[in-house]
Amino acid sequence: MIQKETNLVVADNSGAKKVRCIHVFGGTGRRYAALGDQIMVTVKAAVPNGVVKKKDVCKAVVVRCAKEQRRKDGSYIRFDENAVVLLNAQGEPRGTRIFGPVARELRDKRYMKIVSLAPEVL
């Protein structure tokens, strides 16, 4: 469950390390984002000479969420941290590598590029 002001880890090599959620897409009063949902983030910490800089605002998709989420088969999926992958205007990942596992829900939401770059899909 990601909401405004939530701090997240970036799971790609776009140059950002830590980001903060500033908006949840998907309706006027939508409060929470879960696995596979798009959010607007601002970069709070970045590596030098990266693609994105500190204070940049960009879209991101949630790939790991600490709050458990129920699946269709009745099982639950939960991760140790909240993590996102930064997206460009076309919805493609800005980085060329993904670090750590990603959730299977991204395949259902048609983020095939992220799923193919990820080392593990849970």
Swiss-Prot record:
UniProt keyword terms in alphabetical order: Ribonucleoprotein, Ribosomal protein, RNA-binding, rRNA-binding
Stored SUPFAM superfamilies: Ribosomal protein L14
Gene3D superfamilies: Ribosomal protein L14
Molecular functions per Gene Ontology: large ribosomal subunit rRNA binding; structural constituent of ribosome
GO cellular component terms attached to this protein's record: cytosolic large ribosomal subunit
Biological processes per GO annotation: translation
Function: Binds to 23S rRNA. Forms part of two intersubunit bridges in the 70S ribosome.
Matches recorded under PANTHER family: 50S/60S RIBOSOMAL PROTEIN L14/L23 (PTHR11761), LARGE RIBOSOMAL SUBUNIT PROTEIN UL14M (PTHR11761:SF3)
Family indicated by similarity: Belongs to the universal ribosomal protein uL14 family.
HAMAP family associated with the record: Ribosomal_uL14 (MF_01367)
UniProt-recorded name of the protein: Large ribosomal subunit protein uL14
Organism: Chlorobaculum parvum (strain DSM 263 / NCIMB 8327)
